[in-house]
Design a protein with these regions (language model features):
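Residue-level signal for the short linker/turn that defines the boundary of a DNA-recognition helix
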Residues: 8, 19-20, 46-49
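Short alpha-helical DNA-recognition segment
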Residues: 19-38
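Short, basic-rich loop-to-helix N-cap that marks the start of a DNA-contacting helix
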Residues: 43-53, 72
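Short, charged recognition helix plus adjacent turn
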Residues: 67-73
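DNA major-groove recognition helix of helix-turn-helix/homeodomain DNA-binding modules
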Residues: 49-64
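Alpha-helical residues within the helix-turn-helix
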Residues: 15-16, 27, 56
Length: 73
């Protein structure tokens, strides 16, 4: 079975939305700035609810924020 790696466009989306800071996004979705940092770096996979909250904060579909990269092991 292939290992799935979740990638994201959060940093790009933040900059496309008036250079929103990590803290501003964190406040909008109800988490800490450190959580946003970890998600952006790929060190933390958000819950489904948080993933949708982030997409809603940018007013984009979920697949524009998060996507899966397949890696063959």
């Amino acid at each position: 079975m292939e290992k799935l790696t979740i990638q994201n466009n959060i940093r790009r989306l933040r900059f496309d939305h008036d250079e929103m800071t990590q803290q501003q996004l964190a406040d909008k979705v109800g988490v800490t700035r450190q959580t946003i940092v970890a998600i952006e770096k790929g060190n933390y996979s958000p819950s489904l609810e948080l993933a949708f909250r982030i997409a809603l904060a940018f007013n984009v579909p979920l697949h524009e924020v998060f996507f899966v990269e397949e890696r063959h092991s």
